[in-house]
């Protein structure tokens, strides 16, 4: 996962990351069907949809297009797998953890294949897919594998002749809807804790990027998870996504995506069976650079924080607040970084920025860039598409940005860095919190008092101090306000996938 300076830590026993392998340029896509009950199925409608390589705009393949009847079939399989007495329910907790470890082993074995598929489907650099996405996926499966036999209740002292204790039980059938920006990693964030706790899953990958989810399904079958435990239905939001969100036999849903769609998911969940909902939504994240900060570190982290993954991150540092004493120097260095950022073929090991995911996202970003120009921000570099490069956008930096500009208010989800100026801490706290979002924030300062004050005052689910995008499977992640609710990762994620049952037993006499 990303470290303080945008590099990657690997966690290998010798501390050395594996060498970057060559991508598999002519990789055959083997898995394109719906995965239910450990078998591959054609859609009941007979429809298919195409998935495209954003880098070349060429069609990769066609994938079976699921719909409500396919979701119903998947839920039926998941329910059967969760029934008392089923192979999955009879499996002890230690064995569940071993299956997750074995799944991580197979992901490690096929890491180059999965990274290649991710790069083909998303356009993200192979370097990042291999060292960030796949590394995080493997670590997430291993982390929750370790938790499987450690989920336990408590004995509760009472003032009566009873024994009182709690049981933490799996919820049942869990729905999951994953985004296109980190397809496999976000799948792992949802699948690993759900399986760790003993649930079954019906998952919809984003229609733009279904290929790694379907490949993972083949590994789930190879490992030996019982039929029906994991079911994957590719398709579109208004059909498959809506069917999962509103299904009366799905007991919990986890969604990562836009705030607008998150509202629809919550509404559908409420109208159906009041299923439990975890939402990880958008962000307009402040990155605060104080005058006493290590400017080299702050510039690099802010750069990686907004341009990583083509800017297509809910955690993007999309509002950089810089104290006025160092504002000019920060802008100058940021422009230098942006101009040097390698943009191009995502399979080239030197590339750090690939294309945007699709034409819709590409057009939205360019429209917001134009709004920045019209509203008076100073365009320092970039500001347009790459010539003759399809969906590629030049790394863009704006200075003299004010809070009322659209680029300072709206989630751009692209390679655009708006830099704002502030005078003092109280001012920047108020401005940073003046948003409907509250996903992440970052602070750069050498002063511990400032760091702690800002960490407490910022209305965000995560605050990074002198680092950015520092994710760990052990650390909970989620948002305040309209950035969502619930937590993924860490011990906190287990509560999202378990029900707490209180058991009280009457005794003849009080135990001492």
Swiss-Prot record:
InterPro entries: Ald_DH/histidinol_DH, Ald_DH_C, Ald_DH_CS_CYS, Ald_DH_CS_GLU, Ald_DH_N, Aldehyde_DH_dom, Aldehyde_DH_NAD(P)
Principal location class: cytoplasm
CDD domains recorded: ALDH_F1AB_F2_RALDH1
Disulfide bonds: none
Subcellular location: Cytoplasm
Entry GO terms, CC: cytoplasm
Signal peptide region: none
Disruption phenotype: Mutant mice are born at the expected Mendelian rate, but all die within 10 hours after birth. Lethality is due to respiratory distress, caused by choanal atresia, i.e. the lack of communication between the nasal and oral cavities. Mutant embryos at 11.5 dpc lack detectable retinoic acid in the ventral retina, nasal epithelium and in the nasolacrimal groove. At 14.5 dpc mutant embryos display shortening of the ventral retina associated with lens rotation and persistence of the retrolenticular membrane, indicative of retinoic acid deficiency.
Binding site for NAD(+): 204, 207, 257-262, 361, 411
GO aspect biological process, one term: optic cup morphogenesis involved in camera-type eye development
Modified residues (N-acetylalanine): 2
GO molecular function annotations of the record: 3-chloroallyl aldehyde dehydrogenase activity; aldehyde dehydrogenase (NAD+) activity; aldehyde dehydrogenase [NAD(P)+] activity; NAD+ binding; protein homodimerization activity; retinal dehydrogenase activity; thyroid hormone binding
Entries under Gene3D superfamilies matching the protein: Aldehyde Dehydrogenase, Chain A, domain 1 (3.40.605.10), Aldehyde Dehydrogenase, Chain A, domain 2 (3.40.309.10)
Tissue expression remark: Detected in embryonic head (at protein level). Ventral retina.
Entry superkingdom: Eukaryota
Alphabetically ordered keywords of this record: Acetylation, Cytoplasm, Lipid metabolism, NAD, Oxidoreductase
Pathway per the UniProt entry: Cofactor metabolism; retinol metabolism
Subunit structure as annotated in this protein's UniProt entry: Homotetramer.
Recorded family membership: Belongs to the aldehyde dehydrogenase family.
Function as written in the Swiss-Prot or TrEMBL entry: Catalyzes the NAD-dependent oxidation of aldehyde substrates, such as all-trans-retinal and all-trans-13,14-dihydroretinal, to their corresponding carboxylic acids, all-trans-retinoate and all-trans-13,14-dihydroretinoate, respectively. High specificity for all-trans-retinal as substrate, can also accept acetaldehyde as substrate in vitro but with lower affinity. Required for the biosynthesis of normal levels of retinoate in the embryonic ocular and nasal regions; a critical lipid in the embryonic development of the eye and the nasal region.
Name the record gives this protein: Retinaldehyde dehydrogenase 3
Species: Mus musculus (Mouse)
Gene designation: Aldh1a3
């Amino acid at each position: 996962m990303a470290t303080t300076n945008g590099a990657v830590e690997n966690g290998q026993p010798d501390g050395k990351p594996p060498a970057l392998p060559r991508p598999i340029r002519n990789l055959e896509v083997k898995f394109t069907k719906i995965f239910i009950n450990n078998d591959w199925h054609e859609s009941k409608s007979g429809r298919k949809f195409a998935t495209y390589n954003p880098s070349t705009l060429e069609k990769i393949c066609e994938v079976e297009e699921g719909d409500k009847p396919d979701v119903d079939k998947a839920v039926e399989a998941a329910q059967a797998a969760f029934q008392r007495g089923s192979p999955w329910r009879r499996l002890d907790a230690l064995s569940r953890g071993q299956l997750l470890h074995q799944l991580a082993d197979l992901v490690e074995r096929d890491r180059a294949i999965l990274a290649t598929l991710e790069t083909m489907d998303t356009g993200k650099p192979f370097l990042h897919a291999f060292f960030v996405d796949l590394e995080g996926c493997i670590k997430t499966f291993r982390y929750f594998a370790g938790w499987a036999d450690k989920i336990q209740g408590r004995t509760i002292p009472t003032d009566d002749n009873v024994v009182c204790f709690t049981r933490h039980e799996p919820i049942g059938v869990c729905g999951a809807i994953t985004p296109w920006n980190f397809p496999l990693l976000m799948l792992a964030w949802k699948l690993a804790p759900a399986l760790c706790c003993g649930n079954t899953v019906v998952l919809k990958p984003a229609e733009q990027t279904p290929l790694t989810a379907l490949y993972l399904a083949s590994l789930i079958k190879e490992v030996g998870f019982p039929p029906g435990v994991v079911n994957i239905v590719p398709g579109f939001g208004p059909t498959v996504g809506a069917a999962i969100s509103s299904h009366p036999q799905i007991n919990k849903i986890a969604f990562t995506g836009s705030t607008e769609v998150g509202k629809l998911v919550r509404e559908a969940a409420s109208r159906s069976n009041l299923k439990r909902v975890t939402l990880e939504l958008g962000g307009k994240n402040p990155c605060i650079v104080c005058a006493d900060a290590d400017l080299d570190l702050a510039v690099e982290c802010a750069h990686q924080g907004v341009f990583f993954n083509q800017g297509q991150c809910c955690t993007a540092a999309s509002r950089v607040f810089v104290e006025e004493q160092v504002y000019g120097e920060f802008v100058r260095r940021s422009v230098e970084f942006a101009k040097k950022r390698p943009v191009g073929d995502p399979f080239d090991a030197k590339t750090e920025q690939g294309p945007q995911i699709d034409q819709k996202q590409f057009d939205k970003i360019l429209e917001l860039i134009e709004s920045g120009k019209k509203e008076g921000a100073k365009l320092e570099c970039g500001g347009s598409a790459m010539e003759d490069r399809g969906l590629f956008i030049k790394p863009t930096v704006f200075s003299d940005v004010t809070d009322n500009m659209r680029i300072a208010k709206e989630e751009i989800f692209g390679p655009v860095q708006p830099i704002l100026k502030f005078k003092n801490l109280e001012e920047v706290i108020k401005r940073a919190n003046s948003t409907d979002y509250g996903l992440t924030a970052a602070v750069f300062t050498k002063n511990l008092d400032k760091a702690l004050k800002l960490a407490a005052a910022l209305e965000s689910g995560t605050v990074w101090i002198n680092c950015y995008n520092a994710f760990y499977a052990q650390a909970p992640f989620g948002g305040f306000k309209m950035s969502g609710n619930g937590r993924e990762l860490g011990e906190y994620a287990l509560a999202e996938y378990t029900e707490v049952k209180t058991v009280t037993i009457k005794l003849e006499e009080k135990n001492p």
